Amino acid sequence: MHSIFLFIFIIINLVVVTSVRAETWVLPPHGIDIFGQIRTTQASRTETLLDIARQYDIGQIEILLANPTVDRWLPEDGAKVILPSRYIIPHAERKGLLLNLPEMRIYYFPETKQGEKPMITTYPVGIGRMDWVTPLGVSKIVEKKKDPTWIPPKSLQMDRIANGEQPYPSIVPPGPTNPLGRHAMRLSIGGGSYLIHGTIKPFGVGMRVSAGCVRMYPEDIEALFDKIPVGTQVQIVNQPIKLGWLLDSLFIELHPPLEEEEAIYADYWQMAVNAIND
């Protein structure tokens, strides 16, 4: 008999932990799609929920959805905080980097040498806003830069002016005011105009805040940067509904669809049921 389980970040086996950054897990074999473990921690009066999210390598929207009764800015001292750190691998080739836009999370499949077990690591990311959508498709890393210089695109400058904001300087040198942070990796998609990069605004990780690029916590892209060679495949997919098997149990993981596709997902629950039946 098969069992079906639904989780929207929150599923079984809550484990209390004290500190975790991005963990590397053994990649489950094909036919098993789930890895990681749901955990809990306790808030202290000196930190916000977003501080906790960064400490445990979770995005802002992820931790808010997992903890709807915990105040974002002033969590009660000792409040239990659920850390949504169990994942269904998106349905795509398990190779290189795999970004699922609705999930705002990227998966990394390191190349495996003979005799080594295949591994998987995952990181939260920020993605493009509704009017600056991060493009879907199969791409690759074509360039890597440490301490990059940033030339703001004309479209972004015009947007800032239209919103009554000061435009950026025409050239932003490396340093603490550079929005790209200290690391940038250029994608082939979109004529090379999209980057995976760090940020000087880490609270935007796990949100739709960019002009189409992919933002990572500074410490995450620093850890990833030297592991990713030029030529690494990057898949960008749109899967708000994910299905995954663990032994004889089918799990379904739901994420809010991208705002521009809300009409398509108007009957979200029925689509989830249809996905199971298919």
Description of each model-found segment:
Residues F5-V16:
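Bacterial N-terminal signal peptides
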Residues E23-F35, Q60-L97, P240:
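Extracellular LysM carbohydrate-binding repeats and other cell-envelope/extracellular binding modules
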Residues P68, D77, L83-V142, K146-T149, ...:
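Intrinsically disordered, low-complexity
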Residues T24-D57:
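Primarily a LysM-type cell-wall glycan-binding module
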Residues S44-L74, P118-M119:
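LysM (lysin motif) carbohydrate-binding repeats in extracellular/periplasmic proteins that recognize
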